[in-house]
Amino acid sequence: MSDSTEAKMQPLSSMDDDELMVSGSRYSIKSSRLRPNSGIKCLAGCSGHSQVPLVLQLLSFLFLAGLLLIILFQVSKTPNTERQKEQEKILQELTQLTDELTSRIPISQGKNESMQAKITEQLMQLKTELLSRIPIFQGQNESIQEKISEQLMQLKAELLSKISSFPVKDDSKQEKIYQQLVQMKTELFRLCRLCPWDWTFLLGNCYFFSKSQRNWNDAVTACKEVKAQLVIINSDEEQTFLQQTSKAKGPTWMGLSDLKKEATWLWVDGSTLSSRFQKYWNRGEPNNIGEEDCVEFAGDGWNDSKCELKKFWICKKSATPCTEG
């Protein structure tokens, strides 16, 4: 995932044909299967003398919020500096979106509490799913990530506080709103998820960082149970990422050992340790003091340790490719 394609995003107010361009992909509200009866271009021009467009504006805003998160997911594949810049742009757009939503939804008296409760439930589920689509970034991206999550929470709060005051008294219209929300949530569920929840994406792979501790053999088994392997390192960038992440937790098992033959280091897939990774051993390691046959991330490098000791571990498996259509 090292391609340098830059994510490009147009301001919401200046988009033509209701489209967003991201990393060479075109996201079109008009071409989507989610088609509110009123277009996005009505946002700036619709006034209070039509009830339905106001509600469809709400749906459009929700859909745009979803698109912003898809854009955020796309720009996560770009280098760190560019990724951070694009995330900051998305945060600004999302802030403006929240402000616009607040000013567009009128406050008046509404009825039909049963249908409003169903709509509220759909909004809450939609918001939860949107938040689940945000990749978990490390280091410098954490603050911007928190801001985006905060903006979405504020957006949900505004929606829930005003859902009871929608100027829609016709039961059939409220039913249409409910069906639109159900359809939006269904479409959102279909969005590609590269990694399972609680896993971290990097360079086309998914990584699971354990919260409990096991001995080396049990860690190998734990990874197999989730159709993964105790982590095998294939690049310097991957090594740096894993070393930094594990350093904060403490000694962490990797999928390397010399259990089969002393001083012959093999990964769990049977491949030998490349000479270019020898530089990652801590000073004086491996020293095989007391039959230390399994390798851990320790401090700033690698250390051989006793396999029966309990430590954290990292599982790795290939990310699920997104299918088109």
UniProtKB/Swiss-Prot annotation:
Keyword ATP-binding included in the entry's annotation: no
An example Gene Ontology molecular-function term: D-mannose binding
Pfam families, sorted: Lectin_C
InterPro entries (UniProt xref): C-type_lectin-like, C-type_lectin-like/link_sf, C-type_lectin/snaclec_domain, C-type_lectin_CS, CD209-like_CTLD, CTDL_fold
One of the protein's GO biological processes: positive regulation of tumor necrosis factor production
SUPFAM superfamilies: C-type lectin-like (SSF56436)
Disulfides per UniProt: C195-C206, C223-C315, C294-C307
Function: Probable pathogen-recognition receptor. May mediate the endocytosis of pathogens which are subsequently degraded in lysosomal compartments. May recognize in a calcium-dependent manner high mannose N-linked oligosaccharides in a variety of pathogen antigens. Is a receptor for ICAM3, probably by binding to mannose-like carbohydrates.
Remarks, miscellaneous: In vitro, is a receptor for HIV-1, HIV-2 and SIV, but does not transmit virus to permissive T-cells under the conditions tested.
Name listed for the protein in its UniProt record: CD209 antigen-like protein B
Organism expressing this protein natively: Mus musculus
Gene that this sequence comes from: Cd209b
